[in-house]
């Protein structure tokens, strides 16, 4: 029975602000139930090292390469906006979610511009933004499949009545519908048109663009889009509930509330979660079979799920509703202890049946796709692990961290960045994965849906721009600000320039070779006078111990409390230093024995980085014949792949020297074996040396 009423959905009080606004990526500075807020969107700049090198590729190659893709006949992405804007005649091409994908790319460009102020990037943004402005209806609705179809219909009617081709002036004066809230006007007629997904990413792009540039042209479009969603919700909530597919709009509306303080947005954010219980014939695949407050496990399509959880976490940060936190905490525990890959990736199944939405009656079985499976159902070769789902997992954990300040959430944020988001893009910044399996084999007896190699473009192009915008924003997750507290979350060589209440303007220089080395040096390069401030330095879950020492040696903190923050409170001045040491050593990881595909196997991790074995490094040895001794000793070896510096691991392994398995299902265990030296590379770097076989999990040998 559906328990939620529309009246309940509309009833909410707006939260009072609690902290100073920081103008960050997720600006929780005034969120009543946030304990932390982000630094400003231009506050952190990678200087060198791992993230400096990666950001150089993303900003110098990737954003431009993707712009070329959007302008090409492969994607037709920009073509669709040119037609919708009346700058070009033609039909619309491509999937309906390409609008949102272009908005994600635009957000990536804005995030890079916030750092480097490249005028060429500003020109690119302005070119696209101009088309968005022309394409958007007066009521704020914009969806190029609908806009183009209606524009072409009206122009055809005009040309039929006049007997001649429409002039540019007539095209410019052809205004598409402006009514709100009815399917006949083209809005939300089909849930698989991804309109809320598109509008959500437009709103987010508008907010990021404003914070990055100070300009309001795109932001004004975002406000109109947000107002359209509010109006549609207020007039036709049930139709909107049916259209919450890959619901980026939950996070977007919450962030618009933070930007404006307008209680209408908070009321809509609350209501959009409440009305999920109004959906008739809801599905586990879309997480709407039962109201959200009755959900305690991660189910269904993993992108839709993780975006939902992140959006609900945003709502909690503003409303403080305890029931929402109960749901989110239970779901988080289900993901992390039973359904998440070692890389932070989510979504084990390409296709399957829901283990939740049925009493095992054949006529009630529900299909799921790209989804969470049963607890501990974590296959290797057929792992879907869509990059968008992994990004959603990161976004969910970041918001949980903002609400609690607990390091366990940042552990997963970091894990996702290194091990399930970075693998989605090639080292040269031009090619992308859609899925992220734990194993890749040449001779699978079935065909997987997505390419085995990264490609520049596939028609389902949601992951590449999402990957790019997230990686272009990695610096925004490096620090958080509390009450006279500075949290150091993700280590990397950078500079920070921000303002902390009660402290004033402060600048920090961070020097490190992380993630290859656990030594980090923090130097205060700007601070007026002496100020009391608490530095909170993350001790990752993988670290056996960590030490922090002030430059003068007066204060030393040492801990073996994994997954925590070391704390030093002191009166600081310009020039003061903190040295952090987090020893790194390679370690073997095993899975819970209920993860059947990983039984008897180990994975290798050093620091935050998960490693893999790739056939390129085996000199013709069958990857299936390699086993790693449980007492293996690893040596770090600096290497480069496609110009990118990294640390490989070498060790002595076992080659079982078995015959091929062709035509064989079972056989007697062989005893022939010999020792062989192997090299493992970071998982994010696999597939950058041509087509290859790869595995994260390797049999344990004696």
Task: Outline where the language-model segments fall.
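Well-ordered alpha-helical scaffold segments within catalytic/enzyme domains
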Residues: 49-53, 57, 104-119, 200-215, ...
């Amino acid at each position: 029975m559906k328990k939620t009423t529309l009246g309940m959905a509309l009833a909410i009080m707006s939260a009072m602000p609690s902290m100073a606004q920081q103008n960050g990526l997720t600006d929780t500075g005034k969120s009543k139930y946030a304990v932390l807020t982000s630094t400003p969107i231009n506050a952190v700049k990678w200087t060198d090292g791992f993230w400096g090198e990666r950001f150089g590729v993303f900003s110098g190659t990737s954003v431009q390469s993707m712009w070329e893709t959007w302008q090409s006949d492969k994607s037709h992405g920009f073509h669709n906006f040119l037609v919708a804007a009346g700058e070009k005649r033609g039909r619309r091409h491509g999937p309906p979610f390409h609008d949102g994908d272009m908005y994600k790319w635009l957000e990536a460009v804005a995030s890079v511009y916030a750092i480097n102020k490249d005028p060429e990037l500003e020109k690119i943004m302005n070119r696209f933004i101009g088309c968005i402005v022309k394409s958007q209806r007066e009521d704020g609705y914009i969806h190029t499949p609908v806009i183009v179809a209606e524009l072409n219909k009206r122009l055809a009617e005009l040309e039929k009545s006049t007997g001649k081709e429409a002039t540019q002036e007539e095209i410019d004066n052809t205004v598409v519908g402006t009514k709100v809230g009815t399917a006949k006007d083209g809005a939300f007629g089909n849930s698989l048109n991804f309109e809320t997904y598109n509008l959500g990413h437009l709103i987010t792009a508008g907010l990021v663009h404003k914070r990055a540039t100070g300009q309001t042209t795109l932001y004004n479009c975002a406000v109109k889009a947000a107002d359209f969603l509010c109006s549609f919700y207020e007039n036709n909530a049930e139709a909107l509930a049916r259209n919450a597919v890959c619901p980026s709009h939950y996070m977007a509306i919450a962030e618009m509330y933070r930007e404006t303080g307008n209680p209408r947005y908070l009321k809509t954010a609350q209501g959009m979660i409440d009305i999920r219980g109004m959906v008739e014939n809801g599905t586990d695949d879309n997480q709407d079979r039962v109201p959200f407050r009755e959900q305690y496990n991660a189910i269904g399509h993993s992108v839709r799920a993780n975006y939902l959880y992140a959006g609900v976490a945003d709502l909690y940060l503003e409303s403080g509703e305890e029931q929402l936190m109960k749901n989110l905490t239970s779901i988080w525990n289900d993901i992390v202890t039973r359904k998440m890959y070692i890389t932070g990736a989510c979504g084990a199944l390409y296709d399957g049946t829901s283990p939740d939405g049925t009493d095992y009656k054949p006529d009630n079985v529900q299909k799921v796709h790209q989804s969470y499976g049963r607890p501990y159902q974590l296959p290797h070769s057929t792992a879907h692990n869509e990059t968008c789902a992994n990004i959603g997992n990161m976004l969910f954990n970041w918001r949980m961290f903002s609400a609690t300040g607990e390091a366990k959430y940042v552990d997963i944020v970091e894990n996702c960045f290194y091990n399930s988001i970075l693998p989605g893009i090639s080292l040269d910044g031009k090619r992308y994965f859609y899925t992220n399996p734990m194993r890749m084999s040449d001779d699978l007896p079935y065909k997987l849906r997505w390419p085995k190699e990264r490609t520049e473009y596939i028609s389902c192009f949601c992951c590449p721009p999402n990957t790019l915008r997230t990686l272009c924003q990695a610096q925004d997750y490096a620090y958080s600000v509390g009450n006279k507290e500075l949290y150091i979350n993700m280590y990397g060589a950078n500079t920070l320039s921000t303002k902390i209440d009660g402290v004033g303007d402060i600048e920090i220089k961070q020097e490190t070779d992380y993630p290859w080395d656990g030594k980090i040096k923090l130097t205060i390069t700007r601070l007026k006078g002496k100020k009391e401030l608490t530095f909170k330095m993350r001790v990752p879950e993988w670290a056996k111990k960590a030490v922090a020492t002030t430059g003068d040696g007066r204060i030393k903190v040492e801990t073996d409390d994994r997954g925590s923050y070391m704390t030093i409170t002191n009166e600081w001045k310009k020039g003061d230093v903190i040295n952090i040491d987090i020893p790194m050593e390679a370690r073997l990881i095993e899975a819970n024995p209920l993860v059947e595909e990983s039984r008897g196997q180990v994975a290798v991790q050093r620091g935050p980085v998960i490693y893999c074995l790739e056939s390129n490094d085996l000199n013709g040895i069958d990857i299936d014949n390699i086993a790693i001794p449980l007492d293996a000793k690893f040596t770090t070896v600096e290497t480069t792949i496609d110009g990118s510096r990294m640390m490989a691991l070498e060790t002595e392994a076992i080659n079982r020297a078995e015959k091929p398995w062709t035509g064989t299902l079972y056989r007697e265990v062989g005893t022939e074996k010999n020792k062989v030296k192997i090299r493992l590379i970071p998982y994010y770097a696999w597939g950058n040396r041509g087509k290859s076989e790869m595995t994260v999990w390797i049999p344990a040998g004696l």
